[in-house]
């Protein structure tokens, strides 16, 4: 956790440098007193870094997302870093079984020559940490270059949708979304929501569920369609900021 917060400056730098690096973020309590319980506040910090952000519910999700994350992040029209996030304790401090892929398959090969940002000699050693010198000035071209590059990074994140949807079987999962009461969540909050739904149904209350798998890109249209019949939407989160509820609103 402290590693993520100490590395915050690097995340937007990776995105701006178009480096398809993957990090696995284990979301546990970040404030004192220390806790290994889930706390997705640091995911809130990652939302505007230019990274892809996926949120695993289970150990199986985490395993699958890690492998599939490389495939998406390394696409030439994407080529930005990805954070595969999972929740503390329920995923990080428990044991579970996962289904492994067949032994005779491997990840798609990565071709560095299809990098959308050519590596120039002045940038190659040890790694292209900084863009061309002309942007390091206080003038219009410096501002315009920086601003337009941020838009390109956001566009790259959006372009990842078409690669992500077939790999993850959609950006969301839906269960009984025709009901008037819905729970919309991500990560292990979805697992706890399923138990809440089971208890509510025992009392005659029918509740549907929407599981969000990718936070960046955020499935705005998918969520809008899934919740179009809902009169009440509950968004359980393991953080004090309520960032997922704001995205859904």
Where are these regions (language model features)?
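A short secondary-structure junction signal
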Residues: 64-67, 94-97, 194-196
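Short, ordered loop/turn segments at secondary-structure junctions
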Residues: 2-3, 25-29, 87-89, 212-214, ...
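Phosphate/diphosphate-binding loops
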Residues: 57-58, 79, 108, 240-242
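Conformationally flexible catalytic loops at phosphate/diphosphate-handling active centers
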Residues: 81-173
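Short beta-strand segments
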Residues: 22-26, 55, 83-87, 184-185, ...
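Thiamine diphosphate
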Residues: 1-41, 46, 51-74, 155-249
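Short coil/turn connectors at secondary-structure junctions
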Residues: 16-22, 41, 48-51, 76-81, ...
């Amino acid at each position: 956790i402290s590693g993520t917060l100490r590395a915050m400056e690097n995340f937007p730098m990776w995105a701006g440098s178009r480096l398809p690096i993957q990090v696995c973020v284990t979301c546990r309590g970040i404030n004192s007193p220390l806790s290994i319980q889930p706390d997705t506040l640091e995911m809130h910090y990652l939302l505007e870094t230019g990274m892809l952000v996926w949120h695993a519910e289970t150990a199986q999700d985490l395993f699958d997302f890690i492998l599939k994350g490389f495939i998406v992040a390394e696409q030439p029209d994407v080529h930005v870093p990805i954070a595969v996030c999972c929740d503390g304790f329920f995923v990080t401090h428990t044991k579970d079984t996962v289904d492994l892929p067949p032994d005779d398959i491997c990840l798609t090969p990565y071709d560095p020559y299809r990098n959308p940002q050519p590596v120039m000699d002045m940038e190659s050693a040890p790694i292209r940490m900084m863009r061309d010198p002309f942007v390091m000035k206080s003038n219009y071209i410096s501002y315009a270059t920086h601003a337009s590059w941020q838009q390109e990074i956001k566009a790259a994140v959006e372009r990842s949708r078409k690669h992500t949807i077939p790999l993850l079987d959609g950006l969301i999962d839906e269960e009984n979304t025709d009901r008037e009461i819905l729970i919309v969540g991500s990560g292990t909050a979805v697992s706890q929501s399923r138990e809440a739904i089971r208890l509510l149904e025992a009392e005659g209350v029918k509740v549907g569920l929407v599981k969000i798998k990718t936070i960046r890109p955020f499935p705005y249209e998918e969520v809008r369609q899934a919740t179009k019949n809902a009169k009440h939407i509950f968004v359980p989160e393991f953080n004090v900021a309520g960032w997922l509820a704001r995205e859904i609103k």
